[in-house]
C-alpha cells in the first residue's frame, strides 16, 4: 500500500511546476525501450571492442606475461599492458594506489592486467582467455583483523573527542560493550560499466561513459594520454543506476577505451560483462565496529567509545572520507555524552572498496542502534522508550562528538507522529501476546530514527555550475554538472527552471552532462545533486530574469524588482506581456539570453586536526517502523509491514521523493538482510553474479508499505527550502534489522540481546536463535 502526496506544502515558492508530482523526464522512453544508454548508441563506423584480462591470483608478483596467442587470436587489433601507457599509470581519484593495469604487483583477485582490442566484443573476450601469465603468489591479507594485526592501513587513523570518556565511563552505573560485523554490498546497477571513446582530430577525444563524475573521467583520461584536459570531452546523458559505484570506478574503463582509441585511431567500446564487473569493481565497505557505552538507571547514555574499522581493500580510493562519515554518523540521533570516536582504514587484498549510497553513514549509524537495543534489553525496557530518552535536545544535550550543534531538530516530532500513525504501542502489546502463544513463528517490531548530514565532507566539492540558453521561441536548454542515474535529478532541475520563468515544464530541455559546457564539476553524490545543481540553475535563471525585468520595467519607468514571471506572462504592475514576446524584444534589443550559474554551499567547515567543525549544511530526518515474522525452526523471515515518515523539506517533486524513499528503504533492507558478499579462503569473490548474490525481489517488499512526507520547510536556504532525499532513506531500513533482533530476543522474554551480524541472512538468524536457546538451556540447568 503506497501513499502519494500530490502537492507539496503551500509554503513552497511555486507558480506552476515546482512542488508538484511530475513524471520522470525519461520515464516513457525508459519503459518503452527508447531511452539510449551508452551501449544503445549507434556505433560509429569501424567501431572496435575491448575486453580486459583479470588476475586469477589474490596477491603476488607477475614474473612472466605471454600474450602472443592473444595477439594472434582472430580479429585482434591491439593488446596493451601497463608498459603501453604514455602518461600517468596511477589513476587514484584522491590518493595514489590504483594502477590502470597491474604494474608488476597483483593486489587483488580480479585486478586488470591487460586489455585487448578486436573487431567484435566476442572476439575480444575470446582472445583474453588465451593469455599465459605467471604470478608468484604472496600471502594475502583478507580481513580487518589481519590488517590491524599487521598494522596495514591505506590512510592514517582519525579521532574525535568530546569530554573525558574514560572518567565518565568508569563513573557510569551501567556499562556495556559489543562488536558488530557489517558486510559490504554490491551496487548491482542494471547498466554495467561501459564507455565509448571516439578519437577526433588534433588529439581530441570524445568519450561517452556511464559515470557519476564526468570531470574526473576527463582529468584521468587526459593524464593517461598525457594531454591537456581541454582535449578531452566527456558526455553523460544517463546511467542505468549508479549508487556510488560509478563515482570513481567508472574512470578506469573509460581510460582504457580512450587509450586504445588513441593508439589505433578508431572508436572503441568497452563494456564489462556482469561477472567481471562484480569482480573488478569496489563495493560498499565491510566494517568491523566495536563500542563501549556507560549509562544510568534510565538508560541515558553518559559515555561512549566507538571504534570504526573499515575494510578499504587494497587502496585508499574514497575510504578516508567514507570512514570519516561513518564516524560522523555513529551517534545517529542520540547524544553520546563524553565520547571518543576512532576510525581506522584497513588495507586488505580485496578490490578497492568505494562509494555506496550513504557513503559510510549506514555502517556508522547501525552501531548506534545496536547500542540502544543492548541498553534496552539490559534494563528490561522497550527499545523505543530508551531511544526517546537519548535523543538530542535543543538545550544542553545538543552537540555532536565533532562539535556541531544540532539545530532545527525534527526527530522527536517525527517519532511522536510515526508512533501514533503506526499504532506502535498497541501493536507492541499485540505482538507480545502473539509471541507468548506461538511456539514457532515469532514477531518483531522496531521503530528507529535517522539523522543524516547533507554536504560533501570534502569542502571544495560543495560547488556547482550551470549553463542556461533561452531561445527566441521561449524554449530553453539547461546544462548542469549533475548526472542523471534514475534518481530524477534532471526532472527536478527542469522543474526549477520552469518554475523560475513561469513556463510549462515541456519548454525546458535538460541536456546531457558535458565537460565542455560546465567545467570542473563535482560528482553527483552525497545526496547533493539537487541542492547544488538546483541552486546553480536557479542562479543562471535569476541572471536572465534580471536582464528581462530591466528591459520590461524601463518601458514604464518602474522598479525592475516589481516584475514577476508567472503563467507564461511577465507582469509589471498592471502591465503584462507574453513571455515569448518579451524574449523577442530582448533579442532585438541585443540582450544576452544565455547565462552561467554558480553555487557554493555556505556555513560548512571541518578541522581534521581537532576533529571539530560543522561538516554539514543541514540534517535530513526520518523514522521507520518495521514488523517482521520469523520462523524459529529455519531462520526464514518476512517483513510484514513498514511505516515511514520522512523529512524532505518542501518537496520539489513529491512522487519522485516518495519513489526515492521506497527504493532507498528496499536497498537498505537488502544490505541488512539478503545481500551477502562471499569470498573464498584465497580471496576470490564467489558471490559474483545475480544467481549467487541476492538483491531483494518483488516478493520481499512489505505487503503493507506506508510512506508519508513530513510537511515542514528546510530552515536553511536550500533550493526552495527542500531537502536531499538520495541517501537518508537507505538508513530507514535499520528498523528491519532491529525488528529481527526483537523477534529473536522474544525467546528470552526480551532480556538477551541477540548476536546478529549484517547481513542478517536466514542462516545468521537461525544461528542467533540457536545461541539464545542454548543460553536459556544453560541458565535453566544452573
Please report, for each region that a protein language model flagged, where it lies by residue.
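Short glycine-rich loop/turn motifs
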Residues: 48, 103, 191-196, 288, ...
Amino acid at each position: 500500500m503506497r501513499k502519494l502526496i500530490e502537492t507539496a506544502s503551500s509554503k513552497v515558492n511555486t507558480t506552476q511546476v515546482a512542488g508538484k508530482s511530475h513524471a520522470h523526464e525519461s520515464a516513457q522512453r525508459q519503459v518503452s525501450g527508447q531511452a539510449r544508454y551508452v551501449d544503445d548508441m549507434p556505433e560509429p563506423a569501424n567501431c572496435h571492442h575491448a575486453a580486459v584480462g583479470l588476475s586469477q591470483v589474490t596477491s603476488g608478483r607477475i614474473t612472466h606475461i605471454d600474450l602472443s596467442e592473444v595477439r594472434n587470436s582472430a580479429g585482434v587489433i591491439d593488446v596493451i599492458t601497463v608498459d603501453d601507457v604514455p602518461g600517468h599509470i596511477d589513476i587514484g581519484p584522491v590518493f595514489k594506489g590504483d594502477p590502470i593495469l597491474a604494474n608488476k604487483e597483483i593486489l587483488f583477485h580480479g585486478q586488470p592486467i591487460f586489455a585487448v582490442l578486436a573487431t567484435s566484443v566476442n572476439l575480444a573476450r575470446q582472445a583474453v582467455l588465451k593469455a599465459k601469465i605467471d604470478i608468484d603468489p604472496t600471502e594475502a591479507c583478507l580481513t580487518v583483523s589481519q590488517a590491524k594485526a599487521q598494522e596495514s592501513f591505506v590512510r592514517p587513523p582519525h579521532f574525535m573527542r568530546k569530554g573525558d570518556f574514560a572518567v565518565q565511563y568508569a563513573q557510569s552505573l551501567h556499562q556495556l560493550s559489543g562488536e558488530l560485523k557489517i558486510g559490504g554490498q554490491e551496487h548491482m546497477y542494471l547498466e554495467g560499466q561501459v564507455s565509448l571513446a571516439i578519437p577526433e582530430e588534433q588529439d581530441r577525444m570524445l568519450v561517452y561513459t556511464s559515470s557519476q563524475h564526468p570531470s574526473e573521467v576527463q582529468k584521468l583520461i587526459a593524464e593517461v594520454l598525457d594531454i591537456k584536459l581541454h582535449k578531452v570531452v566527456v558526455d553523460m546523458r544517463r546511467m542505468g543506476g549508479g549508487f556510488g559505484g560509478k563515482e570513481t570506478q567508472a574512470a578506469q574503463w573509460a581510460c582504457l577505451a580512450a587509450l586504445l582509441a588513441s593508439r589505433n585511431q578508431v572508436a572503441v567500446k568497452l563494456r564489462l560483462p556482469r561477472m567481471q564487473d562484480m569482480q573488478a569493481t569496489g563495493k560498499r565497505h565491510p566494517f568491523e565496529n566495536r563500542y563501549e557505552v556507560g549509562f544510568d538507571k534510565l538508560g541515558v547514555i553518559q559515555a561512549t567509545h566507538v571504534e570504526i574499522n573499515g575494510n578499504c581493500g587494497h587502496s585508499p580510493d574514497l575510504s578516508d572520507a567514507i570512514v570519516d562519515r561513518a564516524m560522523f554518523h555513529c551517534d545517529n540521533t542520540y547524544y553520546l555524552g563524553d565520547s571518543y570516536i576512532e576510525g581506522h582504514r584497513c588495507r586488505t587484498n580485496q578490490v578497492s572498496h568505494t562509494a555506496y549510497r550513504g557513503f559510510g553513514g549506514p555502517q556508522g549509524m547501525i552501531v548506534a542502534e545496536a547500542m540502544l537495543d543492548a541498553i534496552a534489553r539490559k534494563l528490561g525496557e522497550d527499545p523505543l522508550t530508551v531511544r526517546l530518552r537519548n535523543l538530542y535536545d535543543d538545550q544542553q544535550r545538543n552537540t555532536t562528538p565533532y562539535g556541531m550543534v544540532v539545530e532545527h531538530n525534527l526527530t522527536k516530532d517525527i517519532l511522536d507522529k510515526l508512533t501514533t500513525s503506526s499504532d506502535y504501542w498497541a501493536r507492541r502489546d499485540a505482538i507480545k501476546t502473539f509471541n507468548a502463544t506461538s511456539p514457532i513463528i515469532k514477531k518483531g517490531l522496531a521503530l528507529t530514527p535517522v539523522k543524516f548530514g547533507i554536504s560533501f565532507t570534502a569542502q571544495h566539492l560543495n560547488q556547482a555550475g550551470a549553463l542556461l540558453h533561452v531561445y527566441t521561441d521561449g524554449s530553453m536548454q539547461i546544462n548542469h554538472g549533475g548526472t542523471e542515474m534514475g534518481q530524477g535529478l534532471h526532472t527536478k532541475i527542469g522543474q526549477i527552471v520552469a518554475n523560475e520563468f513561469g513556463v510549462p515544464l515541456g519548454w525546458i530541455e535538460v541536456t546531457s552532462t558535458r565537460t565542455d559546457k560546465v567545467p570542473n564539476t563535482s560528482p553527483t553524490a552525497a545526496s547533493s545533486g539537487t541542492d547544488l545543481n538546483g541552486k546553480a540553475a536557479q542562479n543562471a535563471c535569476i541572471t536572465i530574469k534580471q536582464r528581462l525585468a530591466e528591459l520590461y520595467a524601463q518601458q514604464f519607468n518602474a522598479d525592475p524588482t516589481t516584475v514577476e514571471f508567472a503563467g507564461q506572462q511577465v507582469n509589471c504592475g498592471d502591465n503584462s506581456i507574453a513571455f515569448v514576446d518579451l524574449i523577442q524584444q530582448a533579442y532585438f534589443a541585443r540582450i544576452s539570453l544565455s547565462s552561467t550559474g554558480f553555487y557554493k554551499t555556505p556555513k560548512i567547515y571541518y578541522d581534521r586536526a581537532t576533529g571539530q567543525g560543522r561538516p554539514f549544511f543541514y540534517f535530513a530526518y526520518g523514522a521507520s517502523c518495521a514488523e517482521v515474522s520469523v520462523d524459529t525452526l529455519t531462520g526464514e523471515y518476512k517483513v510484514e509491514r513498514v511505516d515511514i515518515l520522512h523529512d524532505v523539506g518542501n518537496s520539489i517533486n513529491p512522487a519522485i521523493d516518495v519513489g526515492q524513499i521506497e527504493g532507498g528503504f528496499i536497498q537498505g533492507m537488502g544490505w541488512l538482510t539478503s545481500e551477502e558478499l562471499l569470498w573464498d579462503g584465497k580471496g576470490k569473490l564467489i558471490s559474483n553474479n545475480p544467481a549467487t548474490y541476492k538483491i531483494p525481489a518483488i516478493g520481499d517488499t512489505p505487503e503493507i508499505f506506508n510512506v508519508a512526507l513530513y510537511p515542514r520547510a528546510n530552515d536553511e536556504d536550500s533550493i526552495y527550502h527542500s531537502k536531499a532525499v538520495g541517501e537518508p532513506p537507505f538508513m530507514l531500513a535499520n528498523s528491519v534489522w532491529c525488528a529481527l533482533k526483537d523477534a529473536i530476543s522474544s525467546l528470552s522474554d526480551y532480556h538477551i540481546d541477540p548476536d546478529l551480524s549484517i547481513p542478517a541472512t536466514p542462516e545468521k538468524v537461525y544461528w542467533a536463535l540457536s545461541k539464545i536457546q542454548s543460553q536459556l538451556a544453560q541458565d535453566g540447568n544452573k
